[in-house]
Amino acid sequence: ASDVYKRQDKKSLRTLMLNVIRGDYRNSLAAINLALNSEDSETAHYAASVLQDVLNDFRSKVQTDYLLCQEENEQQVENCIKFVEYMNPILEQQVLTNLEQRSMAERMQEVLQKAWELDKIKISSTVYEKVCQRLLEVKDYEKCTLWCDRAMEQYPGVLSSYTCQMKLYFSCGKKEKFFQVMQELRDSDIAIDNETLEPVSYTHLTLPTT
């Protein structure tokens, strides 16, 4: 019976890892966890090797696309935005080392900075939110603040502009600013749910060490 379970485990793991390769990142975290925690060493080794292949492909494409983003042409802004959108799903999973995660997040915002300087109107609120979240995860509060402010300036009527600032201030331990933004959100015409206004919703974020 255990062999049957092992085969099923390996089959489901293979399916999940293939999802990662195809770019379906919704199931990738489950695949990665399964890879690292599988009791079957063969399965764990197989999954880990597939994951490394995925990450190596990611690093290679990041390098290529980064150079593409430096080319001054009509597609430069679009290339920069596509670069951010490509990087986000992998960075979101936080499967890189802390050092590489931080380096990649920095490169992500560097490229978006280029797009912002050239034609910021083309940057969507969703892209602003992505770069804010990735910078927050690596505790780059200074650059995260910069992008949160830009998001609020360009999209003052969008919920994510407020929630990005709230997450930032909560993580920094800036309680007064956190509740100030929350009150501004309450006073706005933006449709919100109760969860957004509950401080407990932010407790999963990393608090500053004292």
Where in the sequence are the language-model features?
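Structural detector for internal amphipathic alpha-helices that build alpha-solenoid repeat scaffolds
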Residues: 12-23, 34, 45-53, 133
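Amphipathic alpha-helical repeat scaffolds of TPR domains
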Residues: 74-94, 125-130
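Amphipathic alpha-helical scaffolding segments comprising HEAT/armadillo-like alpha-solenoid repeats
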Residues: 3, 25-35, 60-64, 145-146
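Conserved small/polar residues in nucleotide/adenosyl-binding loops
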Residues: 1-8, 202-209
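Short coil turns that delineate tetratricopeptide repeat
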Residues: 120-123, 156, 190
